[in-house]
Amino acid sequence: MFETTGFLFTAETTPDVTTDLAGSVGKVEELSVVADAVNVTDSPNCKSRLNSLLVASEIRRSGLDVILQLTGRDRNQIALESVLLGALSVGVNKVLCLSGDQPDKNGPVVVNEFNSNGLIKLSKVISGGTLTDGTKIKNPLPIYPGAADDLYDQLSKPEALSKLATKIKQGA
């Protein structure tokens, strides 16, 4: 995917609230003729859905390249490291690092141990072959972290561009 010289076209899919994995994967199969990769969302709007890594893995097996969206909202360090190791083990090495949508007032409790910047750093540590506690990873593989930012409504704020620049400096 990164070898192209022009624009990359990606499509986004949100896993369904279902136990039918084939249905969630099947809805993106026709995208292979127009998209270079499929972004798989991670419980958007802070709502439970079929596990995004499972869906991403199946899409990858079908021959499409995938970008796993990963939020720090719902997981602590141990869970995030486990998800990243799992992603690498099934060939999913592109991760869009996000802080995550916040829940409604009476919604679930969020973890927020890692924001998007923290996830980018964590991805780079794991790409370097260790976990954050120094444990060596057997058969380490690279992660290609990505970042997103909402600049459209925030360009009037002086910190908007510096937030994006920080993500880029951290390796996104």
Stretch-by-stretch model annotation:
Residues 1-172:
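Domain-level signal for soluble alpha/beta catalytic cores
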